[in-house]
């Protein structure tokens, strides 16, 4: 008879042998496939802990906690001296690259071979906020989710500037015009919550006119911050125990559930003949995304997952883009004046979508803001099968690299957008004029590319452009009132830790 201690020792020995055998098999498979596919070796990060890579995890976590995640990435790549390298992240192989060719391959040629569901749904990082939806799933479920939302990001949706006018006026009416300092960032968060809630749910939150509703906007900010922390923690996510975060998640879920319940009830009333309708499927003229969804899905959990997968990531994108543009414009008064001259040249003309798109310098400002302050810092995907990427291997980094099933690839937009090889020696400088003679193609991908490009990319740029147009029309000058440099605090995307403290004078 074996004792309990002997059973325990035997189990430990078996586990070690299994792990070693699995490691040896993976290495054999890796080198065999690497050779067969004509791939070169990738540079290795020099670890102090080669087994789990805890040294790498520690430096990453420290940078994240100190709000140095963006400069840390620049320092990390500079220390490697290459644009593609691999590191050990808690025992898993992680590939880090800032090569545009690799970004292109992951987004187009091999896009089905790279997924995100195991990272967002499988890991539980997005739970309990977002269920299955367009930004959390792969395969047939992604096809279904994409088809549900696609009609709402067509020209009819993003070219309707009239729906923005009332919200933009409310926003700008809250801006002090006596030259006093104010923070534009929280105002824009409230503005976007109001516009997006009407677009997605058919009813605005009205946080700009009813300050008591601001708690939803604040809860959204904290919810997105928590999701980013959980995604970054990866396998250590089980250590994330934040009761305040859960309270904010509940506020957001309750907000969404209330609108789902009301829409499901309204649908039943229409079907039973109790509800009034302007058209067969649009009671009271509803044309919002949720109303279309409830006609295809009546399961509350499924509806919440689908709408949350749009509501959560979109809540950061537009407001932060405008915030960053105003931050940059305040520090470059000549750019602000050039932009204002272009806008004022329109005179009293009606601002249509076509006229908005025709404002060249405004487009340059939007692009330059995307370039220096991309909302999506990196595109992270997990290999769903063995595959390759076109560059990063061999002594000169020009050979393809082998990506093994389960490898996690971090394609870094932030570094790509600030690379002097792509943008010249002034790559770190805010200079909208550069867009008059550059055609960056895959070196500039603020919304990604290929089939999984952000479906709202035209809508985001249109809304941001319209707000900036109205802003420069109304305010003659824009001054910075905070000399501290930009310091990113990470949510889904980065926002300025110090806010956007400025002052304006009216025209």
Curated annotation (Swiss-Prot):
Q: What happens when the gene is disrupted?
A: Leads to the accumulation of pre-leporin C at the expense of leporins B and C.
The protein's matches in InterPro entries, at most eight in alphabetical order, are given as:
Cyt_P450, Cyt_P450_CS, Cyt_P450_E_CYP52_ascomycetes, Cyt_P450_E_CYP52_fungi, Cyt_P450_E_grp-II, Cyt_P450_sf
Q: Which UniProt keywords apply?
A: Glycoprotein, Heme, Iron, Metal-binding, Monooxygenase, Oxidoreductase, Signal
Instruction: Tell me the GO molecular function terms.
Output: heme binding; iron ion binding; oxidoreductase activity, acting on paired donors, with incorporation or reduction of molecular oxygen, reduced flavin or flavoprotein as one donor, and incorporation of one atom of oxygen
> Does Metal-binding show up as a keyword for this record?
yes
Q: Which family does it belong to?
A: Belongs to the cytochrome P450 family.
Annotated positions binding heme: 454
> What is the protein named?
Cytochrome P450 monooxygenase lepH
Quote the EC number: 1.-.-.-
Q: Which domain of life is it from?
A: Eukaryota
In the UniProt record, the gene name given for this protein reads lepH
Signal peptide residue numbers: 1-23
Its cofactor is:
heme
According to the record, glycans are attached at 315, 367
State the SUPFAM superfamilies in the record. Answer: Cytochrome P450 (SSF48264)
Q: Provide the function of this protein.
A: Cytochrome P450 monooxygenase; part of the gene cluster 23 that mediates the biosynthesis of a family of 2-pyridones known as leporins. The hybrid PKS-NRPS synthetase lepA and the enoyl reductase lepG are responsible for fusion of phenylalanine with a hexaketide and subsequent release of the stable tetramic acid precursor, pre-leporin C. Because lepA lacks a designated enoylreductase (ER) domain, the required activity is provided the enoyl reductase lepG. It is possible that the dehydrogenase lepF also participates in production of pre-leporin C.
